Regions:
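Catalytic cores of carbohydrate-active enzymes across secretory and cytosolic contexts
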Residues: 1-611
């Protein structure tokens, strides 16, 4: 009271505190002696002379200007949720009791003597071991075709009486014991700790048709990459998405038009298993999006010694819209594609952290997973307290980017407004402006000004490669505008020619030829002496083996033609006419690519005279 005034902080909810403060102030003033009261009154009068609008308005204007500046800064930031006041709990009587549905899985038991077949069927190692695949096929050849060459479904559907017969078949047991022994010895090989560990991110993995998470060459390369890593004992962890419908199965309609057939996948019948947390619950990661949190479950697909972790959003914790994110490979509109790539990149990084995996190198197979750079940088800045520039150096030094597409149309690009909807908060976490964030995925002379995922992946990578020598040359031209003033051949974009996984793509007939030639059951690709023996093969043997395989190919084509044409109600006369003109001795040219526009299928007819 001696100062002549009291300042009370008044809000909408502290009325009692304000009243108590005023009462206390008045009480103390009344207890003053006359001299103290006179001095306090004099100070109060002096304060009243300066507390007028002529003096205070300048401060009011300054406060208003400051508020406008802060409002402008918050424009690019996600809005805070409104503070919710606690209210008295209200009991709402439900008109009915909603049923609670739970999944129940019934597992068939195998005879103890061949119980290890369940373990063998759960690891995709069988998909590139021809003897293991033939072992499952011979259990029931007809059923094997019906279940789509899926041993997990085979063991669920096969008649138990047949299993009992097999468990007493000495020839079958000798073969199955030997194959299982090879499998366990394969997995027991000590890991090679001298090479760096790698996290391999890809939108698709082509490992086997029973796991429908691929559509073309990019996925097949990724699948072969993991298989070869397993064979070579390299420490690689795969990160991808698990799709409910995957890519469509193509059929031809009555008029020859394409029909896309989507078939929902039952995750309990494919070679994946849920990843559990410490409490035995399905492990999930989450991303915060506008007004909601999206969760993704983790699944493990063992690929020999390599672990492939797959994420999916199709479960009850998510909204109907978000459950559909991982329904289709490359499905939906541009916004759904962005969601998929956020799940793959940011969600994939959070999955690695949840699993306790700390790779030395991060490999992006195409630009779909480029958001891993944002999430890694956020971690380095927020948790390791590094600057943006320091974080960029660390990320670039440990990131590799493989590009596949030689034309601009094949590279994903998104509108700025769409990105602002989902990652508007990231620039503040990286201590940069929104424009600086956008510049990471743009080119200065890009008239569309879209955010290009391949540009982002390029800027986050120290090494970048095409998939052939020619493609490397084309890619240097395609990305050269990111570095104006440099010559094409001065760029750090190289090439690694695509290869294939030997055991997946070499037919058993050729394996028998190589075994007879080298005297060894398995052809060692790193043994130059074995390669030298290839030149000892007689031309007749090469031609004979090739024609044997070609005949098998044409038999399969006739079989598929018959099945497809009967469904289209094609006349038997037409079917017989087509089948009779298929000649395995004729030169046959096939176009084994998807008919997407940027694939340029019209190149087939570019030189008709030569064709």
């Amino acid at each position: 009271p001696g100062n002549g005034c009291l300042v009370l902080n008044r809000t909408d909810s502290n009325e009692k505190d304000v009243i108590a403060g005023m009462e206390e102030f008045i009480r103390k003033f009344m207890q003053m002696n006359p001299e103290e009261a006179a001095a306090a009154s004099q100070k109060a009068w002096e304060i009243s002379r300066i507390a007028n609008w002529n003096t205070l308005f300048s401060y009011y204007s300054e406060a208003y200007r400051f508020a406008l500046e802060k409002s402008e800064e918050r424009r690019d930031q996600p809005r805070d949720y409104t503070r919710i006041l606690e209210a008295t709990e209200v009991q709402v009587r439900k008109p009915f009791q909603a049923p609670v549905w739970k999944d129940i899985y019934v597992q068939s038991e195998l005879p103890e003597r061949i119980a290890y077949l369940k373990e063998l069927s759960s690891n995709l190692w069988w998909s590139w071991n021809s003897e293991a695949e033939f072992l499952f096929r011979r259990m029931d050849p007809t059923l094997w075709e019906e279940v789509g060459h899926n041993p997990k479904r085979l063991l669920e559907a096969i008649d138990y009486k047949r299993l009992v017969v097999l468990a007493d078949d000495e020839v079958f047991l000798d073969d199955s014991d030997r194959i299982y022994r090879e499998f366990t010895e394969y997995l027991a090989r000590p890991e090679n700790r001298e090479l760096p560990s790698v996290a391999y991110f890809s939108m698709e993995f082509g490992i086997h048709p029973s796991l429908k998470i691929y559509s073309g060459g990019l996925g097949v390369l990724a699948g072969d990459y993991l298989k070869e890593a397993s064979d070579s004992n390299v420490d690689i962890t795969g990160i991808g998405l698990l799709y409910r419908y995957g890519y469509f199965r193509q059929k031809l309609g009555p008029k020859g038009e394409q029909q896309a057939i989507y078939e929902a996948e039952d995750f309990s019948q494919i070679p994946v298993e849920p990843v559990k947390d410490g409490n035995g619950n399905h492990l999930t990661i989450q991303l915060t999006w506008p007004g909601r949190t999206v969760k993704a479950r983790l699944w493990l697909a063992p690929v020999g010694k390599v672990k492939l972790y797959l994420l999916d959003t199709d479960f009850e914790d998510n909204t109907h819209e978000d459950r559909a994110i991982t329904h289709y490979l490359y499905g939906g509109d541009s916004e759904n594609r962005l969601k998929q790539e956020l799940i793959l990149g940011i969600g994939g990084m959070r999955a690695l952290i949840a699993l306790g995996i700390k790779p030395d190198v991060y490999h992006s197979n195409e630009g779909h997973s480029a958001f891993i750079g944002f999430e890694r940088m956020r971690h380095l800045i927020e948790d390791e307290h590094l600057t943006f520039e320091e974080s960029m150096e660390i990320i670039r030094a440990s990131t590799l980017f493989t590009t596949h597409t030689p034309v601009p149309a094949g590279h994903d690009a998104f509108e700025e407004d769409l990105l602002r909807k989902y990652i508007s908060h990231y620039h503040t976490r990286l201590n940069i402006t929104w424009d600086q964030l956008m510049a990471l995925g743009r080119c200065q002379d890009d008239y569309e000004r879209k955010f290009n995922m391949s540009f982002l992946a390029t800027r986050f990578s120290q090494e970048m490669n095409g998939v052939s020598q020619l493609h490397g040359h084309v890619s240097r031209g395609l990305f050269s505008r990111l570095w104006p003033g440099y010559l094409r051949d001065e760029l750090y974009i190289g090439h690694v020619t695509n290869g294939v996984h030997y055991s997946t793509w070499v037919a058993p007939e050729w394996e028998q030829v190589y075994e007879k030639l080298t005297g060894k059951r398995h052809f060692d690709l790193c043994d130059r002496e074995q390669w030298a023996k290839i030149y000892q093969l007689e031309d007749e043997k090469v031609y004979e083996t090739k024609m044997k395989l070609k005949k098998r190919l044409f038999d399969n084509i006739r079989k598929r033609l018959q099945s497809d044409m009967l469904e289209r109600h094609v006349s038997p006369r037409t079917l017989m006419n087509i089948s009779s003109h298929l000649n395995e001795k004729a030169l046959t040219i096939a176009f084994a690519r998807r008919f997407a526009t940027y694939k340029r299928a019209s190149l087939l007819f570019r030189d008709l005279d030569r064709l």
